[in-house]
Amino acid sequence: MDERKIQGDGAIARILIVDDEPDIRFMMRLIFEAAGYQVTEARHGAAGLKSIKARQPDLVTTDVMMPMMDGLEFIERLRSDPETAMIPILVVSGNSELAVAANTRLGKPFDARDLLHAAALLIREDGG
């Protein structure tokens, strides 16, 4: 089953990974790139917002517990800005607190197939 990446306009879907753990970002990058996605990384919410201003992704994955700006504030800021409010958000966190404004959530540790399936569904639902 090919769950990836190509949007309706033929462009490769872009995913922004926001997580303070380098190993998690690395693992997610490998999974997404192997499936054909373009990946950008940020180590906290503030860096994620800066990255989004430079180039808007088709999907954002974020942790909840991070320094500088946690995932909940990050999501709140995305949702309150008309330019970013509709970006699908996948929370990937070991924290059981569910970000209400996120589209869906996966726990850590996660299965690569579940991660790819959730990403593909969110990108597809967004019209990608």
What are these regions (language model features)?
Residues 1-14, 113-128:
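Non-catalytic signal-transmission and effector/linker regions of two-component phosphorelay proteins
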Residues 21-25, 98:
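Short acidic/polar segment at the start of the alpha1 helix of CheY-like receiver
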Residues 26-34:
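Charged docking surfaces used in two-component/phosphorelay signaling
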Residues 41-50, 71:
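Helix N-cap/capping motif at the beta->alpha junctions
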Residues 50, 72-85:
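Short amphipathic alpha-helix used as the core "switch/output" element in two-component signaling
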Residues 55-61:
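Active-site beta3 strand of CheY-like receiver
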Residues 66:
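Receiver (REC) domain active-site loop signature in two-component systems and cognate sites
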Residues 90-92:
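Hydrophobic/aromatic residues positioned on beta-strands within the core alpha/beta folds
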